[in-house]
Amino acid sequence: MEATAPRRRHLLPLLLLLLLLCGECPPVSGCNEKRMLAMLPRCGKTFAEMMKKVEVWKWCNLSEFIVYYESFTNCTEVETNVVGCYWPNPLAQSFITGVHRRHFHNCSVDRQQWQDPPDEILIPLIVVPILLTLAMTGLVVWRSKRAAQVV
């Protein structure tokens, strides 16, 4: 019993120190969505400030601002983790989507329209394999008949 008393005396200051140091730790109870939604706009504001350095006509070229976008993504991840939320989550994704709408609404993916090649190219591409298949089949049949006659 006497050995446990000194341990208990040291335990209380350690617990108090832990509580003091862990004042900014994420809550154990889970995600604090209100705090997350209050903190994420800082990331958006910082990203908007960085995007001002890029000319507007270059906003659709990811290579022009990839460093800024990476910083924005890291910021949203850190802010959601600080408040005890996982990342990505639906609220963070909707915030990120809003930032995308604000900055990249004029960027559309140009879908390439595929067309068949001209008939001069298409017909040989179809006919040659068919003729080769028929020729090889005929050759195999002819050789097998010839081999049967030799025996």
UniProtKB/Swiss-Prot annotation:
List the GO biological process terms.
adenylate cyclase-activating G protein-coupled receptor signaling pathway; adrenomedullin receptor signaling pathway; calcium ion transport; cellular response to estradiol stimulus; cellular response to hormone stimulus; G protein-coupled receptor signaling pathway; G protein-coupled receptor signaling pathway involved in heart process; intracellular protein transport
Q: Which residues lie on this side of the membrane: Extracellular?
A: 31-116
Please tell me where this protein is predominantly located.
membrane
Q: Specify the protein's topology with respect to the membrane.
A: Single-pass type I membrane protein
Site: Required for CALCRL interaction. Where? D116, S144
Q: Which residues lie on this side of the membrane: Cytoplasmic?
A: 142-151
| InterPro entries membership | RAMP (IPR006985), RAMP_sf (IPR038126)
Protein localization: Cell membrane; Membrane
Bilayer-crossing residues are 117-141
Under the GO molecular function aspect, what terms does this record hold? coreceptor activity
Cell membrane listed as a keyword? yes
Keywords of this entry? Cell membrane, Disulfide bond, Glycoprotein, Membrane, Receptor, Signal, Transmembrane, Transmembrane helix, Transport
Q: Which residues form the signal peptide?
A: 1-30
**In this UniProt entry, which cysteines form S-S bonds?**
C43-C75, C60-C107
GO cellular component labels? cell surface; plasma membrane; receptor complex
Specify the glycosylation sites in chain numbering: N61, N106
Question: What is the annotated role of this protein in its UniProt record?
Answer: Accessory protein that interacts with and modulates the function of G-protein coupled receptors including calcitonin gene-related peptide type 1 receptor (CALCRL), calcitonin receptor (CALCR) and G-protein coupled estrogen receptor 1 (GPER1). Required for the transport of CALCRL and GPER1 receptors to the plasma membrane. Plays a role in cardioprotection by reducing cardiac hypertrophy and perivascular fibrosis in a GPER1-dependent manner. Together with CALCRL, form a receptor complex for adrenomedullin/ADM and intermedin/ADM2. Together with CALCR, act as a receptor complex for amylin/IAPP.
- How does the annotation summarize its subunit structure? Heterodimer of CALCRL and RAMP3; interaction induces allosteric modulation of CALCRL function and ligand specificity for adrenomedullin/ADM and intermedin/ADM2. Heterodimer of CALCR and RAMP3; interaction form the receptor complex AMYR3 for amylin/IAPP. Interacts with GPER1.
- Protein family per UniProt: Belongs to the RAMP family.
What name does the UniProt record give this protein? Receptor activity-modifying protein 3
Gene source species: Sus scrofa (Pig)
